[in-house]
């Protein structure tokens, strides 16, 4: 076995064993035993039908009417049993696959969402289309593991059963080799079947091997194409306002062309493989008859024996030709395994304890909020900000300023615990906090769930309270739609979405609030009104904001300018306008 094959088997087992050793292992193994038992039952009925062939065709040759009808009755019993076992085998296998897929999908989703791994994967471009890997690759993996492994098992059992039958039926062959005389070969049909299937398997693997990489590329390209379509749909209004349809068409056509080009390569390789497999299958129809005819013409076997040998030979070569018949599926399974393995490796790296010397430590003890000697980097390690230190007072509103691209939003993300690239300590205290981006995330569902997100356990909030908050933020037109299920991110404008974000803040009552350009879609009067709503609440949160409007200066107590923390080689020489309030004092510790 080559290194690549060993790695594939190891990776496949690494993914599969998690389920078979999980809390569902007993039900899984029980279902698997039931599937194996029903499939073995179908093999037994096949052996019975093979023996029936001899009796039935001998009766036909002898014009034995009574025996013919007796054999037809036997066939009805064997056929009914075989059909029943086959139906239950498929049903039980699908049930097992469904259970396995559900469990494995939940496992990957938990790992993907744990510790914000999904966000870090997006920042680092670690793997492409993780949603496709979860939705499609897991389905393919579980399906192919069960289908191919059970198919291989049944092929081996069938091979063992019919090799014994074929050995007894084929008899010896005496092959003249000139001066060497006759070579006596017992069970010669068995050796013919082995050679025939072995040659076909070798050529199949040789021709079909490139299908693995082509399948990998195809899955990636299909995922990219679907993502571009979904992204267009989500941003339909922006595209329409720009008149960007020709550009989008060009993007779609380019990605579709890549899919078509890859698929043409698959077609070419599959065509070569089909020439082999189809020719192999057609020759196999008459091949066993040709090799057994000498015994039939010498009257060593009758018509029934001839048909039984042909049937046994077909079972043997079909079992030996498992790789030939299922190679495209094997290639697709290998591709799905590779994609899941790469995905799992990335998730494992993100979940593992950080051993690198550069890391951001979030401390959640004590009442104070502050930063101590924080360095921030870009994902590629490029320095962004150096030596940040500050400690806002409790209940204070701080506006973070600096030139565009300084890292203002990055600082907020680091304080919210979602930006991992850098080194230093951030204290956010024991109080609850909330990060509000420029465009709030509005999940699919009712307006009530959208308002309470992510604290859906607070569904006990009275409807009157929800309506009151909606009215406060200027969304009184939605007060009668609390139970309406809608795609709110498409229905509401940016300004309305930002108002809804403020409503969510008022309901959550966080003690520490991070606001990132949250009023960019609002006019100045509403901007002032919403900030006043926050500052007038009895729980008076500590607010750390990022924004570019000069009107924000009068809505905050302090201004924290990041210019002084830009690495020297990146500092901007042009002075900033003087703030309207006193810069926040640096804190030596917190």
Predicted regions and their residues:
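Primarily ABC-family ATPase nucleotide-binding module
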Residues: 126-127, 344-399, 422-429, 468, ...
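Cytosolic ends of transmembrane helices, especially the final helix of ABC transmembrane type-1 domains
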Residues: 208, 212, 223, 240-244, ...
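A hydrophobic transmembrane-helix motif
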Residues: 37, 41, 45, 50, ...
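Conserved "ABC signature" C-loop
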Residues: 440-487
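Membrane-integrated ABC transporters
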Residues: 1-46, 55-75, 89-93, 118-156, ...
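Helix-to-loop junction immediately C-terminal to a conserved catalytic motif
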Residues: 416
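An intracellular "coupling" helix at the cytosolic face of ABC transporter transmembrane type-1 domains
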Residues: 138-142, 214-234, 240-287, 329-332, ...
